[in-house]
Amino acid sequence: MVAYSTPSSSLHKPSPYNESRRMARFRPSNILGDPFALATISISILAWVIAFISSIVSAINARGYPTYSWWGVAYSLCIILGMTAVFGTDTGSVYGVAIVGYLSAGMVITTLGVNSLVYRSDSASQAAGAGFILMSMVIVIWIFYFGSTPQASHRGFIDSFALQKEHPGAYGNGRPMSTAFGNRPETTSSQAPQMYTSAQLNGFETSSPVSGYPGGAPGSENRSSSQPRFGNPSNANLTANGNENEVPQPTEYPYRAKAIYSYDANPEDANEISFTKHEILEVSDVSGRWWQARKSNGDTGIAPSNYLILL
């Protein structure tokens, strides 16, 4: 029988969403300090109350009330509670795709409720249909907001009024986050590469080295390689003798970026920096996977681009 040992961390792909593994804390100030969140949630609650009370009155006084509309009332309540949690925990950028999916289903349900109620003769059913119409309008606004990237101009304009969110300097000139996985600045290390025996690899060894990954297989924990991983090393990193030096620190940081997740620097790599969620960093170059950044306290280093959003 094959004995399974504890999986090595080098065999697992690191997740860029470490922040999402911890339950986000609900803060009422995220809603009270955001006019968009406060207004849309308040209007949706008002719309739901109108639809709910009118549905009760219509079901009591009139015959043939469409039972399907009760599912629309229940689903609308779930949407309101879910959106309140999203705004309160400020996790819209994390669950944006799921939010749009649930809102799209709610749009269909409320629209069917409008079609089955607004054309009835009794005033209570018409009032319930009006509540569903108002709820549908709020859902359309939410879909347009969460269905857009954080770099969208209209979303930056809306977020600029919130007290708990950073205000982009020029929301009309928002730039999308770079998806080009270019060269990471190379670092030097005096440590020898870690070697594994056949027993430690436990069947994962190969007869030839992995092509295209000098210095080890992809996912290796040793991130301080003396050989370039992608392409040729920059001439700025080479001395006259051909030896590789530390990455020179830039003097200008023309870009500003906001951290959408917290990041803890690798203790084995002195060139990385740690930062917290919503922290603003100054960035010198945005062309690669790792950006040279500077914090407000003057600390400089490299930061993963998928943790940052350009302002």
From Swiss-Prot:
Sequence ranges of Polar residues compositional bias: 221-248
SMART domains recorded: SH3
Keywords, sorted A to Z: Cell membrane, Membrane, SH3 domain, Stress response, Transmembrane, Transmembrane helix
Keyword flag Cell membrane: yes
Cytoplasmic-facing ranges: 1-35, 89-93, 148-311
Lineage: superkingdom: Eukaryota
Keyword Membrane part of the UniProt annotation: yes
Regions crossing the membrane: 36-56, 68-88, 94-114, 127-147
GO cellular component: plasma membrane
Region (Disordered): 172-191, 207-251
Extracellular-side positions: 57-67, 115-126
Membrane topology term: Multi-pass membrane protein
Domain SH3 positions: 252-311
Compartment(s) where it occurs, according to its Swiss-Prot or TrEMBL record: Cell membrane
UniProt function note: Plasma membrane osmosensor that activates the high osmolarity glycerol (HOG) MAPK signaling pathway in response to high osmolarity.
Record text on subunit structure and interactions: Forms homooligomers.
Family per record: Belongs to the SHO1 family.
Protein name, per record: High osmolarity signaling protein sho1
Protein's organism: Aspergillus flavus (strain ATCC 200026 / FGSC A1120 / IAM 13836 / NRRL 3357 / JCM 12722 / SRRC 167)
Top-level taxonomy: Eukaryota, Fungi, Dikarya, Ascomycota, Pezizomycotina
